[in-house]
Structures are given as structure tokens and as C-alpha cells.
């Protein structure tokens, strides 16, 4: 918790949210996250609102899993929003590099364990000083690159043996 640092001292915080893991792996888990979301946000994603990719059958279990996934994304958005609000309240938001990412793509039917697009597409959103809002890059990024970026942001030289690159470097 960065609140214990000296005033003006730089900090590094890695905050993990449960994300899609909130939804569980079965009907019981799906119902639980949807009830939590409904209590917290006043509504849950309706099965009727779910738009599946064309290669998924519109089976009730798949639709409910997808709805629960969408609700877990909504809860993640709230959690991330709370962190951003705290940074703003403490007056450090404009001078803080914030990275948002997941460890894998959507884990529906085929997504996580096989080489399907939804499992390979991993979000990475970066905001902070010198980051132009709305910029979209097509770079191939590996999770190890986040370590290199973090070291560089802290002014620490990236070791030569590290198989990573600072994705924000000019080169």
C-alpha cells in the first residue's frame, strides 16, 4: 500500500483483481457473480443481451457463461476505477504510470487452452506521463516486457540477460 511511503517518494504497486476468475467454472459460479454484480451495480447482464461470436452455438450454458464473463468485466472496471480515483484523490495520478493487463484472453469454451483468437488477445492499456491518450499500437508484446518497462520507468537499467524490451522506448 503506497499510503505508507514518505511524501513525494516514488512507488510501485501491483494490484491484482480477480477479473474473469470471478465468474467461476459452472452455473453456481455464474449465478454468484451475477448476483454480486446486480447487488453492486443494480443490474446484471441479461442472456438476451449476449452476442456470441458466430462459431459458438447458442447453448444456454455458453450464453450464461458469457453473461457472467461480461459481468466480471463490469466488476473489474469498478475495481480499476477505485484505484484510479484514489490516485486522483491523492494528487499523484498525473505522475503515475498505470498499466492494465490480463494474464490471458477470454477463457470460454476454447479460448484459454487453445490457440483461438479470443484466448490470444490479451488487453494491455497504459496511461501516464508522456503517454498520448487514444494511441493504439500493434506491437507484439510479451508479459516479460512489462518487467523491462517497469525497470526503465524506475530508472533501473534492464539487465542484458533479460529477454525483454521496454515497449515504451523510442528504439
Features from the language model and the residues they span:
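Active-site-proximal cap/lid insertion segments
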Residues: 2-147, 151-170
